[in-house]
UniProtKB/Swiss-Prot annotation:
This is UPF0259 membrane protein YciC. Residues 41-86, 141-151, 210-224 are periplasmic. Keywords: Cell inner membrane, Cell membrane, Membrane, Transmembrane, Transmembrane helix. The gene is yciC. Its main location: membrane. The chain crosses the membrane at residues 20-40, 87-107, 118-140, 152-172, 187-209, 225-245. The keyword Manganese does not apply. Coiled coil: none annotated. InterPro entries: UPF0259. GO terms for cellular component: plasma membrane.
Length: 247
């Protein structure tokens, strides 16, 4: 059977419209979890204020020089802030991926679904999803640090891994290997969707500061919710595409 991107886009749009409120609630819950965890594990405001003390920002030629000019205590604060942001983001993304994929599975099986039920049903697979998303994020970031393009290619090749892990109950490394093989064979169908997702995320990042006009916390929740909705659309597309490829 010939698969066209247009038909998968149409199916994705229909599913997203029909399940919008459930997907929105999952996205909002994941955004709230991300922001709360980030706040809990981040350094205090007083500690963050120390990062500006005695650091010659104007004289630093890059991030590496800036970090070198920091005191050991400031470096520890920066490391804690980075770790808190990364950890909370990974947790939120794992719950989002599990919740959205479970919504699709439950709806496809003709069952009624709610945001809490979808997240609860995804609980057994969340540890594996967390490890998978951590590894894929690490690979993509390493690729972006090299020359950007390798990171984008890795993001495309690994896109189907979460769907395979949940739908076929694969292991973490098996889903990574299978995703790379299957995506490479169907690059024309996967690449445009992933590139559109990356572009949408980049545009959202550029305008993220405007959300802080309300309060930093509410702005962070709104920005994360929109980011989660964008990711949810991609997950729906990838799930539908994967099911068609398997037929």
């Amino acid at each position: 059977m010939s698969i066209t991107a247009q038909s998968v886009y149409r199916d994705t749009g229909n599913f997203f419209r029909n399940q919008f409120m459930t997907i929105l609630l999952v996205s909002l819950l994941c955004a709230f979890i991300t922001v709360v965890l980030g706040h809990v594990f981040s350094p205090s405001d007083a500690q963050l204020a120390q990062l500006n003390d005695g650091v010659p920002v104007s004289g630093s030629s890059g991030l590496f020089d800036l970090v070198q000019n920091m005191s050991p205590e400031q470096q520890q604060i920066l490391l804690q802030a980075s770790a808190a942001s990364t950890f909370s983001g990974l947790i939120g993304n794992a719950i989002l991926a599990g919740g959205v994929i479970l919504i699709i599975q439950l709806v496809s099986a003709g069952q009624r679904v709610s945001a809490l039920r979808a997240i609860g049903a995804s609980a057994p697979i969340l540890p594996k999803l967390f490890i998978l998303i951590f590894l894929t994020t690490l690979l993509v970031q390493i690729g972006i640090m090299l020359v950007v393009v390798p990171g984008i290619i890795m993001a495309i090749l690994l896109a189907l891994a979460p769907v395979m892990l949940v739908q076929d109950k694969m292991g973490v490394f098996a889903s990574i290997r299978s995703s790379m093989r299957l995506t490479w064979a169907n690059m024309r169908l996967v690449a445009p969707a992933v590139l559109s997702w990356l572009l949408a995320k980049t545009l959202l990042l550029l305008f993220a500061s405007s959300f802080a006009a309300l309060t930093p916390e509410i702005g962070a929740v709104l920005a994360n919710t929109l980011s989660n909705l964008i990711s949810a659309i991609l997950l729906i597309y990838l799930f539908r595409l994967y099911m068609l490829i398997r037929q």
